[in-house]
Swiss-Prot record:
HAMAP family: ATPase_RavA. It comes from the Bacteria. Signal peptide: none annotated. CDD domains: AAA. This is Regulatory ATPase RavA. It comes from Salmonella typhi. Transmembrane segments: none annotated.
Length: 498
């Protein structure tokens, strides 16, 4: 078996070759390739003329000697046109009911059925068996069919509560396509002279029959780690609790997990990773409403839980709360305290300075910086006599901000715990402390918890960086996940700097 990273590189190059000359169809090609490599079915929804059939034709070139069958369904289509005509010779000579399947669906590896919902019951019933069991009953014999990929297409969804729902449920990947949107891509498409029938894939990249069969076994060996299963189960519970969520059968969940295993395998990994779960957005929707719902639920899962983003923010909130408690305790211990001297008949209490404040000029530190008179202030210098007068009689008090310039008027008061408090213009206040009493350093307990949290964040970010090289996931999702992790990291860094 090829080295996992070499296999991932080969599949990436194979996809690039298949995408050549197709504009704004890279994601569709990649998911159809993933479906083909894992033996699943795809439904393409979109208006006529947007290269749905060309996508299916291209996938034939991913394999060596692959045969393709395509058919446009009408309400008058017969099983003979899809599964092959009856053998008149066998019926006449031997009385056997047998179809001539050469060139028809039972002998094709790649199958494209356009306007699939117009198929009649006789075709649908046989098609269901072909998709489910990869077998076709031809007369008295059960024949194994080689189909690796079924691409069904339509410009509409099947009607609810119709006989078509069983077939729709078998189509694991569902893609909603639209016209080319980008101006440059539209121009390139108009002037392109590429022959659609040309094989764009070098022989060295094409998949042999032996490789395909071996890969089916290898895909089944990819593990589903417990944390990833928990994410899947969380998503399932969220969907079950939403009133407008689509019904997802157990069979569909099981087939979707195999697709995630294939994504991991062809990305060079031996286990399903959270990044693979993004593929579920193309597997679990039913209509336009549920498509938007799945996008929202997957985004919540990927940007909030898949790499512990919300859990880390919750831990950070607890650490910050604990730090505030410790700071309050420290503030009570280190705050500058005056002595209450109010007499029995005094209309207002008055205070005196403590013995340790004996200097003629007093510099008091703000326990947290405030913006006063358009200046970021960390300490204030008072004239001792002016401070004593204010404590005794009240009135105006002035001090030099950061010990410089002229003394400025201050909004100050003494709180119930006998601590002088200075306030800014928005009335945010902070207590004052004598130099040497204020404790600016972060408590060791908090510092250790923040360092542990930062290490956990780095581990999660490293996991994401290692797993994000997944061919089948659109880069927009990677950007949103990276932004969510960076937001958590920034909040942790801000907490460390406070």
């Amino acid at each position: 078996m090829a080295h996992p990273h070499l296999l991932a590189e080969r599949i990436s190059r194979l996809s690039s070759a298949l995408e050549k000359g197709l504009y704004e169809r890279s994601h569709a090609i990649r998911l159809c390739l993933l479906a083909a490599l894992s033996g699943e079915s795809v439904f393409l929804l979109g208006p006529p003329g947007i290269a749905k059939s060309l996508i299916a034709r291209r996938l034939k070139f991913a394999f060596q000697r692959a045969r393709a069958f395509e058919y446009l369904m009408t309400r008058f289509s017969t099983p003979e046109e899809v599964f092959g005509p009856l053998s008149i010779q066998a019926l006449k000579d031997e009385g056997r009911y047998e179809r001539l399947t050469t060139g028809y669906l039972p002998e094709a590896e790649i199958v494209f059925l356009d306007e699939i919902w117009k198929a009649g019951p006789a075709i649908l019933n046989t098609l269901l068996t072909a998709i489910n069991e990869r077998h076709f009953r031809n007369g008295a014999f059960e024949e194994k069919i080689p189909m690796r990929l079924l691409v069904a297409a339509s410009n509409e969804l099947p009607e609810a509560d119709s006989s078509l729902e069983a077939l729709y449920d078998r189509m694991l990947i569902r893609l909603w396509l639209d016209k080319v949107q980008d101006k440059a891509n539209f121009r390139s498409m108009l002037v392109s002279q590429q022959d659609e029938s040309d094989n764009p894939v070098p022989a060295s990249l094409q998949v042999s029959d032996e490789e395909y069969q071996q890969w089916q076994k290898d895909i089944g060996a990819i593990s589903l780690p417990d944390p990833v299963f928990e994410l899947i189960f969380t998503l399932r519970q969220q969907l079950d609790n939403l009133p407008n969520a689509p019904y997802v059968s157990d069979r569909r969940w099981k087939k979707a997990i195999r697709l995630l295993q294939a994504s991991a395998f062809f990305s060079g990994r031996d286990a399903v990773a959270p990044i693979d779960l993004i593929l579920l957005k193309d597997c679990l929707w039913y209509d336009a409403q549920s498509l938007n719902l799945m996008q929202q639920q997957l985004e919540i899962l990927m940007t909030g839980h898949a790499w512990q983003q919300q859990a880390m923010l919750t831990r950070l909130g607890g650490i910050v709360q604990r730090r505030l408690q410790l700071q309050q305790q420290q503030s009570d211990k280190t705050a500058f305290t005056v002595i209450k001297e109010g007499g029995m008949f005094s209309r207002r209490p008055h205070y005196t300075l403590p013995p340790e404040a004996s200097a003629s000029t007093l510099t008091l530190l703000l326990q947290k910086p405030l913006k006063l008179h358009d200046m970021e202030v960390i300490h204030i210098t008072f004239d001792r006599s002016a401070l004593e007068l204010w404590l005794t009689k009240g009135g105006e008090i002035r001090g030099k901000l950061n010990g410089i310039g002229f003394a400025q008027t201050l909004n100050m008061e003494v709180d119930n715990a006998q601590h002088p408090v200075v306030r800014d213009i928005s009335l945010q206040g902070t207590r004052l402390a004598l130099p040497g009493a204020a404790e600016d350093s972060m408590p060791a307990e908090i510092k250790q918890q923040l360092e542990t949290l930062e290490n956990d964040w780095r581990q999660q970010h490293t996991r994401f960086s290692e797993q994000q090289h997944c061919l089948f996931i659109h880069s927009d999702w990677l950007g949103r996940i990276e932004a969510s992790l960076q937001d958590v990291g920034e909040q942790i860094r801000q907490a460390q700097q406070c």
